[in-house]
């Protein structure tokens, strides 16, 4: 059932692929000469067809210079150094991102801004407008789904840029220029959208479409981050996170997967843990799931997977993060299966011959090491690579792996974090160990397999700073590395601008917890204002 649902959705994504070819043109002719009433009359999957663009747009989140980059790069976990041959310098944009010295003209910001606003205006608001224009009433469930998905796009604008416009309608005057709203106002808007829509959504598992539980999960994340985004007066919102997590748990719709690797396998739609995912399929083409293969693997990696194309040798794990989070010299971490399931490391072998591989010089072993010689002259073999998602044997340029957005493991860990911060360390430890259990051999000593309440609540050094609940933060890293959460985690622990890691010296400037509004947008809209701390 789940498999069929995924494939049907993928075909719908493919049918609208041409509609998503441009993220900067916000006024495409989405349905050509097909009217809304004609679609509803002719299509058994009318609502799915109409809503396809707003889900299909999410496939751009993991493209190069997009959302994944702004949620994981610039943190203690991942980096793109300049290679010794000059590759990946790209005008210094990756080095500036790692050093927190970015400019409002850097392409990441305009790309992400365009992708998110395309999702809101062209993919969500236009659907609502077309129904209104046709004089048709959108059913309550479909309207709730559009509002929840629109809130999903707004969540990322709120997290990354903070102070942004609010646009609920598509039909605006030709020269309309939306006005910047304060972050708190945007937060209140997203909360309202989710609260008013979530209970009108279906309860059954839908994998690649929003249901009631996906909306509640998103709202729980919103409340969890509220204090770090808006101030200490929002600390009480953790109570709401706890309530929402308990509702998801109590629904009995999801459970932890017995296999951590299955969540990120080519058959991820079979995982009982996934609440919401974005499907990719190699037959539907661009955009590709860039960070899991092309962006991270070396260009000589084809024999490892008998692949049709190699990688770009860019994305690497930050060595200090690997050592601090998954220290291979510490048996407690080496026995953690997530260590080898999260990274591509060590000597690589030819899939067909099983023989060890060498780099292009034919002499240097193809052996990824947990060190980077220089941030501006990295060697070919420097750095562990992102290996969390299964790479298909015979991998093409297009990818066949689905992006896991929300999963039940995160629901549990959000609950545990709230309990820990509110003084119930033992309750938090019980949940943490429930999640950890699958990643350790049961024959190992309990002291290896489990974390204690004392460990989780103690002051612990992370990124050179002694912080409360530091071991819990490390555990978040072990469980969720590379899943687009690290920036928010570091901000909640006040480490994003205060922590130190390989090649990164802290700037200790609070305003850097928000990215700048892209300069191109400021030039085209006089009603936008730049975030505090940025001159342009």
Model-derived segments and spans:
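Hydrophobic, small-residue-rich alpha-helical packing segments that form membrane-like cores
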Residues: 170-260
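Short coil/turn linking the two alpha-helices of tandem helical-hairpin repeats
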Residues: 135, 158-160, 165, 205, ...
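Flexible, polar/acidic helix-loop-strand segments at domain edges
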Residues: 94, 98, 327-407
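Conserved, well-structured interaction surfaces
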Residues: 44-62, 86-161, 177, 181-188, ...
């Amino acid at each position: 059932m789940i498999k069929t649902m995924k494939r049907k959705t993928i075909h719908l994504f493919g049918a609208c692929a041409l509609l998503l070819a441009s993220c900067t043109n916000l006024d495409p002719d989405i349905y050509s000469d097909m009217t809304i009433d004609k679609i509803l009359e002719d299509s058994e999957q009318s609502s799915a067809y109409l809503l396809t663009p707003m889900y299909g747009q999410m496939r751009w989140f993991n493209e190069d210079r997009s959302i994944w980059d702004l949620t994981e790069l610039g943190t203690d976990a991942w980096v793109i150094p300049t290679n010794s041959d000059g590759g990946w310098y790209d005008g210094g944009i990756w080095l500036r991102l790692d050093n927190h010295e970015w400019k409002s003209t850097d392409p990441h910001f305009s790309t992400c801004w365009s992708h998110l606003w395309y999702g809101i205006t062209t993919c969500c608001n236009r659907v609502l407008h077309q129904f209104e224009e046709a004089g048709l009433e959108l059913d309550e469930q479909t309207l709730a789904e559009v509002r929840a998905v629109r809130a999903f796009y707004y969540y990322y604008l709120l997290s990354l840029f903070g102070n942004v416009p609010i646009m609920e309608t598509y039909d605006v005057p030709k020269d309309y220029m939306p006005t910047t709203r304060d972050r708190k106002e945007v937060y209140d808007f997203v909360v309202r959208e989710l609260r008013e829509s979530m209970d009108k959504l279906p309860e059954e598992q839908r994998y690649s479409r929003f249901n009631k539980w996906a909306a509640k999960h998103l709202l729980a994340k919103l409340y969890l981050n509220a204090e770090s985004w808006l101030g200490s007066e929002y600390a009480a919102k953790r109570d709401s996170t706890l309530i929402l997590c308990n509702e998801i748990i109590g629904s009995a719709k999801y459970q932890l997967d017995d296999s951590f690797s299955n969540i990120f396998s080519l058959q991820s739609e079979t995982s009982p843990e996934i609440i919401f995912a974005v499907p990719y399929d190699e037959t539907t083409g661009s955009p590709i799931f860039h960070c899991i293969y092309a962006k991270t693997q070396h260009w000589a990696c084809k024999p490892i997977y008998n692949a049709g194309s190699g990688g770009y040798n860019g994305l690497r794990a930050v060595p200090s993060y690997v050592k601090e989070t998954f220290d291979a010299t510490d048996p407690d971490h080496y026995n953690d299966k997530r260590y080898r399931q999260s990274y591509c490391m060590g000597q690589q072998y030819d899939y067909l011959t099983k023989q060890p591989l060498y780099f292009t010089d034919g002499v240097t072993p193809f052996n990824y090491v947990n060190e980077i010689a220089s941030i501006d002259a990295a060697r070919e073999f420097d750095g562990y690579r992102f290996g969390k998602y299964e790479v298909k044997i015979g991998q093409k340029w297009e990818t066949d792996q689905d992006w896991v957005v929300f999963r039940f493991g995160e629901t549990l860990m959000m609950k545990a974090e709230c309990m820990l911060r509110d003084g119930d360390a033992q309750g938090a430890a019980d949940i943490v160990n429930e999640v950890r259990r699958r990643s350790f051999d049961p024959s190992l000593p309990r002291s290896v397999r489990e974390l204690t309440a004392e460990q989780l609540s103690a002051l612990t050094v992370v990124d050179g700073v002694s912080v409360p609940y530091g071991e819990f933060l490390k555990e978040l890293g072990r469980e969720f590395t590379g899943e687009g959460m690290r920036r928010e985690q570091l901000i909640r622990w006040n480490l994003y601008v205060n922590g130190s890691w390989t090649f990164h010296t802290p700037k200790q400037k609070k305003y850097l917890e928000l990215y700048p509004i892209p300069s191109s947008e400021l030039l085209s809209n006089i009603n936008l204002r730049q975030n505090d701390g940025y001159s342009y």
